[in-house]
Regions:
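Acidic, metal/ion-coordinating pockets
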Residues: 1-142
Length: 142
């Protein structure tokens, strides 16, 4: 296991997580055990599982997942997340408002996003991040 201390300027340390569901009253507690390690990565990638919105109505053919508050995404910045997909099976559970609010919040935190969008072209646009002169692109489909 890496201690996260990647000082080599020609190598990038990449961390990728699974589904991120940040619906707890204290979203920082969710990340506390991994904050130090994740924040040491050059590229930290996650999959946002539920909409983060205060708008929209539950709209799903699946069992809908309740939306989480947009501010619950704030810890992702502290953890170093810089690339995320939003194309999970619950992406549309709160309709277009849920998608737009989630995208806008992630982008306001400096996180590049792919997988959903205001239109299909935006959804298909790769998320790109650059660190140490290394560019990483991410696409997300479901």
């Amino acid at each position: 296991m890496s201690d996260g201390s990647n000082k080599d300027p020609q190598r990038a340390l990449v961390f990728a997580t699974g589904d991120i569901i940040v619906d707890e009253p204290d979203p920082y507690s969710f990340f506390e055990p991994s904050l130090e390690l994740l924040s040491s990565g050059d590229f930290v990638i996650g999959q946002i599982e539920v909409p983060h919105t205060d708008r929209g109505e539950a709209n799903s053919t699946d069992i809908p997942a309740p939306p989480a508050a947009p501010e619950n995404l704030n810890p992702l910045k502290d953890c170093g997340f810089n690339l995320c997909t939003t194309c999970g099976n619950h992406a549309h559970d709160n309709g277009v408002p849920g998608i737009v609010d989630t995208l806008d919040k992630l982008r306001s935190l400096g996180i590049a996003v792919t997988g959903t969008g205001r239109n299909i072209q935006e959804a298909k646009t790769p998320a790109i991040a650059e660190r140490k002169g290394i560019r990483v692109g991410l696409i997300g489909y479901n």
